[in-house]
A protein has these predicted regions:
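N-terminal trafficking/processing presequences and adjacent post-cleavage segments
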Residues: 2, 50-51, 65-67, 71, ...
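Bacterial Sec-dependent N-terminal signal peptides
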Residues: 1-8
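Short, non-transmembrane alpha-helical segments in secretory-pathway proteins
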Residues: 8-26, 70-92, 141-165
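A charged, solvent-exposed segment within the mature domains of Sec-exported extracytoplasmic proteins
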Residues: 92-146, 150, 162-164, 171
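A cross-family detector of function-defining hotspots
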Residues: 28-46, 90-109, 165-182
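Short, charged helix-to-loop "capping" segments that act as catalytic/coupling loops
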Residues: 55-58, 84-87, 100
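Amphipathic N-proximal alpha-helical interface segments
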Residues: 38-66, 105-135, 177-184
Length: 184
């Protein structure tokens, strides 16, 4: 059994490997790949399947995607989904997105007939975003924390001290920030 020997380590620096090993010391079946500007480790840890995203140069961790069983979702997320308008849709997959300095998101992929949706919930059960699922493999790279070149995070924290950032996206040359403040 070679599950303790990571695959494709030649793709990432020793610093990235060390940062990964410090964060997930018990990881098994680790396999590295480069996706865009990120070094991504797919692995098993703590009874589940995960993908962790790192900066290949600085070795900074950005995000971990974790496969989650529907019944293991936090109670507020389960309750919100069961009471929501997509409760009668079939649940296809559930992922947890843990991100550096940002709100943890739970993505419930649902389908009904030919329609497929990704439902993004905060850990408090707020449905923050609904996205049509295109059927392509989802990496959630749009939800990776972005460099804060314009000091946006500091501005948000100054104006909304109790807010958590859900998403920062660039649209038509402008940056749009989605926050949760007092569970709204």
């Amino acid at each position: 059994d070679n599950s303790d020997v990571p695959e494709n380590t030649h793709l990432v620096s020793k610093e990235v490997q060390a940062a990964f090993n410090a964060k997930y010391p018990q990881a098994k079946d680790v396999e590295w790949e480069l996706k865009g500007d990120y070094a991504v480790a797919d692995f098993y840890w703590d009874g589940g399947e995960h993908s962790a995203w790192f900066n290949p140069l600085s070795a900074a961790w950005y995000m971990t995607e974790t496969d989650v069983r529907y019944e293991n979702l936090p109670e507020p997320v389960l309750a919100a989904h069961k009471a929501g308008k997509y409760a009668d849709w079939r649940v296809d997959d559930v992922d947890k997105l843990t991100r550096e300095g940002m709100e943890t998101l739970y993505v419930i992929e649902v389908e009904k007939g030919e329609s497929e949706l990704d439902l993004f919930y905060s850990s408090t059960g707020i449905l923050v975003k609904t996205v049509v699922d295109t059927g392509h493999e989802e990496d959630y790279d749009d939800y990776l924390p972005q460099p804060d070149a314009n000091g946006i995070i500091a501005i948000v924290k100054q104006k909304y001290p109790n807010a958590t950032i859900v998403e920062i996206e660039r649209e038509k040359g402008l940056q749009e920030v989605t926050i949760l403040d007092e569970n709204r």
